[in-house]
């Protein structure tokens, strides 16, 4: 997990560095935030994370966008944070500016609060997990009304003919009409039709919330939203096309000079086995079993020890009952925790780590223009230690202390991170 905005006392980095010093580990692939998108988008657009970092800026939206379609909303509560910390908050400011510049918003979410009230956007409340059906109804309307940009599709896409056969029901006998979509998503057919026409007649930005990936078949809403954006022919136009997760964290849509932040070196993991991030239960319940991922078949390794730091699987994993069953399988579960939470209560060994208030660090990220000194405000409580100190002690007992610390103290490492970032910025 993140655990802290600090660049050095980042629990995952510390854990991975330690494990690589003692022979490696089975890693998790992708993130709980948007793993389905990380898997599907490279097959359609390219690297998902690169697309996030180069999202259409709010400045371009303010100058060019006329209609902003918010699938999953633009929840400002999420935009208060970002990986590595936030110095420049701008999501609320830009939303209000956009509303004052006559950009029309529609919040397509079961939650009205997923779009700022001051924006005065329209609210459409679909049944949860039906966004793809809604988008298929929009696609059908665009085609039936001659609103599809055929020239764009022919020049920049492949496979539209196959997709159209599905939309028209030629492959399964079910035309994806607005009436069909309405019965599933519980937004009436006329509203869906009007939404599609408004999208076609305006410079439209489609924003897809990361939350849409964290549902059954979570890759489908992203794939379908990209398809609708392609049908509109506005991908690549200023203020048009598609964006992923405006205000999912603060940085999406930002435009500023970014320091090229340096991270703590983690070393090389000699172990090739991995699991998709949300399949911990499957890993523990089915050792040596097979699983399909991104078009290939892999095997779950046999797992005897689980080590968790900086996060809590009982907070963000799905199907907690099944996770509880799986949690009984390993021989030993170790965690670094600062409080007696659900993870600590279910671990065999709990090593008390301190909080960001009890250590020195530096907040530094390639997604924010600020570098922030994080001062230690209080002494470490009781026997708690930093993650670095915890792993240093274990590494000492295992004979790899020098390899783990790099013969540096935590202060040395923080200074090194700052100095190396300075060098990259100058270069």
Question: What is each stretch, according to the model?
Answer:
Residues 1-346, 350-358, 394, 398:
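Catalytic alpha/large subunits of respiratory electron-transfer oxidoreductases
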Residues 254-257, 414-427:
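Long, low-complexity segments enriched in small/aliphatic residues
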Residues 219, 318-319, 362-364, 382-383, ...:
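Short conserved micro-motifs at the rims of enzyme active sites and ligand-binding pockets
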Residues 354-376, 383:
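Catalytic or ion-translocation cores adjacent to nucleophile or general acid/base/metal-coordination motifs
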């Amino acid at each position: 997990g993140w655990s802290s905005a600090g660049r050095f006392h980042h629990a995952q980095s510390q854990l991975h560095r330690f494990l690589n010093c003692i022979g490696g580990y089975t890693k998790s692939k992708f993130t709980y935030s948007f793993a389905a998108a990380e898997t599907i988008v490279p097959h359609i657009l390219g690297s998902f994370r690169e697309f996030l970092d180069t999202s259409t800026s709010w400045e371009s939206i303010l100058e060019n966008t006329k209609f902003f379609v918010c699938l999953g909303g633009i929840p400002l509560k999420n935009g208060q944070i970002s990986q590595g910390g936030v110095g420049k908050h701008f999501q609320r400011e830009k939303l209000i500016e956009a509303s004052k510049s006559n950009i029309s918003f529609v919040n397509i979410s079961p939650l009205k609060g997923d779009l700022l009230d001051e924006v005065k956007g329209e609210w459409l409340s679909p049944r949860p997990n039906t966004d793809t059906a809604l988008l298929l109804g929009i696609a059908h309307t665009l085609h039936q009304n001659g609103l599809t940009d055929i020239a764009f599709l022919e020049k920049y896409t492949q496979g539209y003919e196959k997709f159209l056969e599905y939309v028209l029901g030629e492959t399964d006998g079910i035309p994806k009409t607005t009436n069909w979509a309405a019965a599933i998503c519980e937004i009436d057919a006329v509203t869906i039709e009007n939404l599609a026409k408004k999208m076609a007649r305006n410079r439209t930005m489609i924003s897809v919330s990361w939350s849409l990936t964290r549902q059954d078949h979570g890759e489908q809403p992203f794939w379908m939203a990209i398809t609708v954006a392609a049908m509109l022919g506005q991908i690549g136009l200023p203020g048009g096309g598609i964006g992923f997760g405006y205000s999912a964290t603060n940085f999406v849509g930002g435009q500023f000079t970014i320091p090229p932040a340096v991270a703590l070196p983690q070393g090389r993991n000699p172990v090739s086995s991995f699991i998709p991030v949300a399949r911990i239960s499957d890993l523990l319940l089915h050792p040596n079993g097979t699983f399909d991922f991104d078009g290939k078949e892999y095997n779950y390794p046999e797992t005897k020890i689980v080590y968790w730091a900086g996060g809590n699987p009982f907070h963000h994993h799905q199907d907690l009952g099944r996770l509880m069953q799986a949690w009984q399988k390993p021989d030993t579960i170790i965690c670094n925790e600062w409080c007696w939470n659900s993870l600590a209560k279910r671990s065999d060994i709990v090593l008390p780590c301190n909080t960001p208030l009890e250590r020195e660090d530096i907040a530094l990220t390639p997604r924010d223009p600020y570098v922030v000194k994080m001062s230690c405000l209080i002494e470490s409580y009781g026997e708690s230690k930093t993650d670095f100190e915890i792993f240093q002690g274990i590494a000492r007992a295992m004979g790899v202390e020098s390899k783990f610390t790099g013969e540096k103290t935590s202060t040395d490492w923080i200074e090194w991170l700052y100095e190396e970032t300075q060098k990259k910025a100058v270069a």
